[in-house]
Curated annotation (Swiss-Prot):
The lineage of its organism: Bacteria, Pseudomonadati, Pseudomonadota, Gammaproteobacteria, Alteromonadales. (2S)-2-hydroxy-3-oxobutyl phosphate binds at residues 86-87, 128. GO terms for cellular component: cytosol; riboflavin synthase complex. Coiled coil: none annotated. The active site is at residue 89. Its EC number is 2.5.1.78. This is 6,7-dimethyl-8-ribityllumazine synthase. Keywords: Riboflavin biosynthesis, Transferase. 5-amino-6-(D-ribitylamino)uracil binds at residues 22, 57-59, 81-83, 114. Catalyzes the formation of 6,7-dimethyl-8-ribityllumazine by condensation of 5-amino-6-(D-ribitylamino)uracil with 3,4-dihydroxy-2-butanone 4-phosphate. This is the penultimate step in the biosynthesis of riboflavin. Belongs to the DMRL synthase family. Pathway: Cofactor biosynthesis; riboflavin biosynthesis; riboflavin from 2-hydroxy-3-oxobutyl phosphate and 5-amino-6-(D-ribitylamino)uracil: step 1/2. GO terms for molecular function: 6,7-dimethyl-8-ribityllumazine synthase activity. GO terms for biological process: riboflavin biosynthetic process.
Length: 160
């Protein structure tokens, strides 16, 4: 049986992190978690990490698409925080953000990790941005590192 799986060390990987400024008090913690994980576990150097800041979560897919189209990156991490309010706005923003980022991954055959918090309350968002429930930015970075390696390994195996 042939099993393809990746590890998380990616010293030479070039990673873009597309970050929403909206709810920045939460998103900055996600960014810190992602960068820390890329450096400590992935051994990714500072010069191989590019941060792109956009106004809100709805702008993440377009920025991610532009990054992917450049061909200069091995993967993209999208970070943001969308918190449910009293209107259906949450559903539109969260849904379109998720769908758009998935489309970028498929269109460009590039790992795009979803580190966008979609929570019902601000307390849930705080818990997921570095307190009780861990740091979802760091988790998104781990998933991305593994997918970068899985796709490289798969490419190599398919050529053999």
């Amino acid at each position: 049986m042939n099993v393809v799986q990746g590890n998380i060390e990616s010293k030479n990987a070039k990673i873009a992190i597309v970050v929403s400024r909206f709810n920045s008090f939460l998103v900055e913690s996600l960014l810190e978690g992602a960068v820390d994980t890329l450096k400590r576990f992935g051994q990714v150097s500072d010069e191989n990490i590019t941060v792109v800041r956009v106004p809100g979560a709805v702008e993440l897919p377009l920025a991610a698409r532009r990054v992917a189209a450049s061909g200069k990156f091995d993967g993209i991490i999208a970070l943001g925080a969308v918190i449910r309010g009293g209107t259906p706005h949450f559903d539109f923003v969260a849904g379109e953000c998720n769908k758009g980022l998935a489309q970028v991954a498929l269109e460009f055959d590039l790992p795009v990790s979803f580190g966008v918090l979609t929570t019902d309350t601000i307390e849930q968002a705080i818990e997921r941005s570095g307190t009780k429930a861990g740091n979802k930015g760091g988790e998104a970075a781990l998933g991305l590192l593994e997918m970068v390696n899985v796709l490289q390994e798969l490419e190599q195996q398919l050529q053999d």
